[in-house]
Amino acid sequence: MASTASNTSKLEKPVSLIWGCELNEQNKTFVFKVSDEDKSEHQLALRTVCLGDKAKDEFHVVEIVPQVEGSDVQPVPIASLKPSILPMATMVGIELTPPVTFRLKAGSGPVYISGQHIALEEDYSWAEEEGEEEVEEEEEEEDPESPPKAVKRPAASKKGSQAKKKKMDKDEEESSEEDSPVKKGKGAGRGRKPAAKK
C-alpha cells in the first residue's frame, strides 16, 4: 500500500476489510466507491479474480474502466480466465484508489473479484501519548543523576589463564607443605626401592 504523508499533525491508523464483488451476465459492471462524507484515505488492493463453479467453458475477460473523462483512455484488462485452462488468477501489486469500475468485457460469468479494502482513519490517541511523553521528560529532568554503569573487564587470554593456574598449583603445594608436619629420619624425602633378595 502506498501511503502519503498527511499535512495535519494527526496520525492515521489503517483499518483493513475483506472486499469482494461478482460480475455476471446480469451485472456486467461493478463500481467500488466510498461515500463523499468519509474523509479517510481509501485503497483497494486486489488479491484474486476467479470463476464461479457455474461458469461456462469460454473466455471471461475482466477489465478496469478508468474514471478519467475523455476518449483517450482505454480500459485495462486485468484477467482473462477459462475454466478448463485458468480458473483463477492471483493479483499482486494492484492497489487502486476509489472510485474503481470493474467490467466483464467477455464471458457470462460468474466471476468473483476479491481484495482488501484499506482505510486510513484519523487516530486521535496521539494527543494522549504526547501528554504521557511530556510527563516522562519532566521526571527525567528532575532526576538527572543516574547510577554508574558497571564496566566489564575483558576476558583473560588462554596464556594468562594457564600461567594463573600454574601459580595457583604452586601456591597450593607450598601451603600443603607448611600445614603438614615435618618428617624426620630416613623416611623423609625420596623413598628407596627394597633390594631384591638372592
Curated annotation (Swiss-Prot):
GO terms for cellular component: cytoplasm; nucleolus; nucleoplasm. Residues 125-145 have a biased composition (Acidic residues). Residues 128-145 are annotated as: Acidic tract A2. GO terms for biological process: chromatin remodeling; positive regulation of DNA replication; single fertilization. A motif (Bipartite nuclear localization signal) lies at residues 152-167. SUPFAM superfamilies: Nucleoplasmin-like core domain. The keyword Nucleus applies. Residues 150-167, 183-198 have a biased composition (Basic residues). Signal peptide: none annotated. Belongs to the nucleoplasmin family. Homopentamer. Acts as a chaperone for histones, such as histone H2A-H2B, and thus regulates the assembly of nucleosome cores. Involved in chromatin remodeling, especially during fertilization and early embryonic development. May be involved in sperm chromatin decondensation during fertilization. This is Nucleoplasmin. It comes from Rhinella marina.
